[in-house]
């Protein structure tokens, strides 16, 4: 959540490259924290609520601010994005073990942050991408639970590669890496990231 708050500050200071980098670091850190809490079996109602608040702050509010709020259309889209992230967290209970219903907010945020870095904050492209992410978050499809740090070794290598790229390579290269990673999760959820078929909702 702290990184999300820093991202918000950078966005208001019009330093979108720093704001985007904070979100990419948060994307990786979120996976590490979830793996750690699962491993040591830390789970409580308060902890779950704090986690949801952190996810909303970082991957909802901070991500939406990448769109800018100095224009009417971008401001409205930012509000819709925050609302979609909030709705997703509050009401999208999958009902199927080890799955997410709708695209998880961290992946949508990662795509927005990566796009911002690759396009140097191009508002039109960011707004188009944000519109797509809203649709994916509100989608009724199921995505596999991404236990990357508790899964096959090659997935752990993907994660380690992301950390190395983010801290030791040019931002454009690390942004491209994270973008491809997140897009692969959207378009090949089961083939690459899940062990069971990506389920469709039953009517």
From Swiss-Prot:
Its main location: membrane. The chain crosses the membrane at residues 60-80, 124-144, 157-177. It comes from the Eukaryota. Keywords: Membrane, Transmembrane, Transmembrane helix. One of its GO terms (cellular component) is membrane. Disulfide bonds: none annotated. It is found in: Membrane. The keyword Translocase does not apply. It is a multi-pass membrane protein. This is Transmembrane protein 269. It comes from Homo sapiens.
């Amino acid at each position: 959540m702290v990184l999300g708050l820093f991202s918000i500050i950078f966005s208001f200071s019009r330093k979108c490259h720093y704001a985007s980098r904070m979100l990419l670091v948060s994307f990786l850190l979120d996976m590490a924290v979830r793996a750690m809490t699962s491993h040591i079996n830390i789970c409580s109602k308060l902890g779950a609520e704090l986690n949801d608040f952190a996810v909303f702050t970082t991957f909802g509010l901070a991500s939406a601010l990448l769109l800018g709020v100095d224009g009417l259309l971008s401001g409205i889209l930012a509000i819709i994005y925050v609302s979609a992230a909030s709705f997703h967290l509050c009401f999208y209970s999958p009902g199927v073990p080890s799955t997410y219903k709708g695209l998880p907010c961290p992946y949508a945020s990662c795509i927005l942050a990566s796009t911002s870095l690759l396009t140097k904050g191009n508002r039109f492209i960011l707004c188009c991408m944000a519109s797509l992410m809203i649709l994916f978050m509100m989608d009724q499809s199921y995505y596999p639970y991404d236990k990357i740090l508790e899964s096959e070794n090659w997935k752990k290598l993907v994660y380690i590669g992301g950390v190395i790229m983010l801290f030791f390579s040019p931002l454009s290269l690390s942004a491209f890496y994270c973008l491809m990673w997140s897009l692969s999760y959207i378009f090949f959820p089961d083939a690459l990231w899940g062990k069971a078929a990506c389920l469709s909702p039953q009517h």
